[in-house]
Amino acid sequence: MGMPLPWALSLLLVLLPQTWGSETRPPLMYHLTAVSNPSTGLPSFWATGWLGPQQYLTYNSLRQEADPCGAWMWENQVSWYWEKETTDLKSKEQLFLEALKTLEKILNGTYTLQGLLGCELASDNSSVPTAVFALNGEEFMKFNPRIGNWTGEWPETEIVANLWMKQPDAARKESEFLLNSCPERLLGHLERGRRNLEWKEPPSMRLKARPGNSGSSVLTCAAFSFYPPELKFRFLRNGLASGSGNCSTGPNGDGSFHAWSLLEVKRGDEHHYQCQVEHEGLAQPLTVDLDSSARSSVPVVGIVLGLLLVVVAIAGGVLLWGRMRSGLPAPWLSLSGDDSGDLLPGGNLPPEAEPQGANAFPATS
């Protein structure tokens, strides 16, 4: 199937049945980030696509291909769709990296340039566009798709806006995307993949113990590859509830999530404990004993490292997901390229999952 003609969107907007109420239709948003001088092995540009709080797309300058995430990997999309996403994001990558080079040349320093671009659907299925940009964590520019210009009050705004206005058709393409392509894509996702928004993937689990301080042990209950992200931990001692521990949750980069909870117990008492989780994907709570797993046979360190490697491909996913889930207006990051390694969740990994060497754990491809 070829690319749709310009008039096809107008016809689709008129004829599409109003099966989704405006209060249930999620926005489609692209979050773009470019950094100066990225840390070794990290991309200089990456993008994530979101349908409401659910990530459906990832792209980075190392792989240079747009890939679907989670349940959207099985969406019955038209043949050209992901090629078009890739082409558009490569164009955005070029614009963002050229802007960074120009800012560095004129003003010196290192920068993080970000954008939040997308749309919601009005009651008549027309686009309610969003196009805002941030520099080093502060919003500094907006794009008006109906006028076709970038505006803001910062000196840096003028530099970036003038650069982009000189690019052939850059403003026209941005307007076309926000007013036409974005609502068309959103409507297509809702028609072809509406069940994906109700996707449920149950977790795999593992319970491990390690020595703590002053005669204690620390239990780590880990849950892997689940969706939606809401999950409830519970530790059991001799079958009775013994608290939920200290919990953390983050995205894997493929649309699913991982989580863990830590509980300090008396050393020698570890085998009296079990870990239990409740999740929408489970018909009943899932319980696991110490040093055993449910629906998983891979060592916890290998799984967590695999998750870390996936997150590297979409650096910043943890922070971005947290902001998107919180409903904050824009998930801006203030880190420069030299600090981009801090976008990764390594500091939040449970101690037994910390890498001990390059060859310590199984690699993932």
From Swiss-Prot:
Record note on quaternary structure: FcRn complex consists of two subunits: p51, and p14 which is equivalent to beta-2-microglobulin. It forms an MHC class I-like heterodimer. Interacts with albumin/ALB; this interaction regulates ALB homeostasis.
Keywords of the record: Cell membrane, Disulfide bond, Endosome, Glycoprotein, IgG-binding protein, Immunoglobulin domain, Membrane, Phosphoprotein, Receptor, Signal, Transmembrane, Transmembrane helix
PANTHER family according to UniProt: IGG RECEPTOR FCRN LARGE SUBUNIT P51, MHC CLASS I-RELATED
Stretches assigned to the Extracellular side: 22-297
Annotated organism of origin: Mus musculus
Protein name (Swiss-Prot/TrEMBL): IgG receptor FcRn large subunit p51
Family: Belongs to the immunoglobulin superfamily.
Compartment(s) of residence: Cell membrane; Endosome membrane
Domain of life assignment: Eukaryota
